[in-house]
UniProtKB/Swiss-Prot annotation:
It is an enzyme of class 2 (transferase). The keyword GTP-binding does not apply. It comes from Allorhizobium ampelinum (strain ATCC BAA-846 / DSM 112012 / S4). This is Homoserine O-acetyltransferase. Its main location: cytoplasm. Transmembrane segments: none annotated.
Amino acid sequence: MPIKIPDTLPAFDALVHEGVRVMTETAAIRQDIRPLQIALLNLMPNKIKTEVQFARLIGASPLQVELTLVRIGGHKAKNTPEEHLLSFYQTWEEVKHRKFDGLIITGAPVETLPFEDVTYWSEMQQIFDWTQTNVHTTMNVCWGAMAAIYHFHKVPKHGLKEKAFGVFRHRNLAPSSIYLNGFSDDFQVPVSRWTEVRRADIEKVPDLNILMESDEMGVCLVQEDKGNRLYMFNHVEYDSTSLADEYFRDVSAGIPIRLPYDYFPHNDDTLTPLNRWRSHAHLLFGNWINEMYQTTSYDLNDIGKGRGI
């Protein structure tokens, strides 16, 4: 079944053009089932592009999903029209009374700052605590993953001498994991970050299990059973051109940047990159949503009971 999103959301037409099944709010009402309620806390500067990336993966599920777009209340977005935010987004304060089957927390362009120096860190801490009582399962991505694993387990992030940037081979460390069902033994994942979390720090926490890792880029995906959380430190959701967009943006701004590793054909930035991670991105999100469906409560009000802070 398709993803349910507002009829006038810019992502609607983009997804239809790609062949992703989407459903109007009017049509969804006629289906006598409870759709999965998934929220996207979008911390990225270009919110519209990020909406499309995650809605594409969610919409490929055979289950009906209702997507709620959420933003930080006290933070002024610089790269997304205010009209778009007012039309399609709610602040966390406006949705915190609700319960959700799933929550995705995106990356944010603040990864070189200490967490405590991020202007909205206090609200992020409240959101993380809120997920324990109001969200069945959370997918934390890039900075969102680093922030969450630091908040819950004090696992630190470490700065890198140069940006981890490109497409890298990763290993499947847990073939029997429900989240890696159908995964190859090795696969490609886009990476774009200035910081990392380290295996040695994660291994100090008994509840954390490393599912995906790269010899060059280190830890990629961590599962925490106790809190129903996944920590994805890289960007499986990226479009084919996302790394190119970042590269040319930095080049235009005069920021020193290397070509993204193993990305442009023949390392020629005039050639169109091939997407070699799309199928595994769909597998990961499909498995996450399937597990969500299998384990969540039919009554949304029961989500989080007995899990508390």
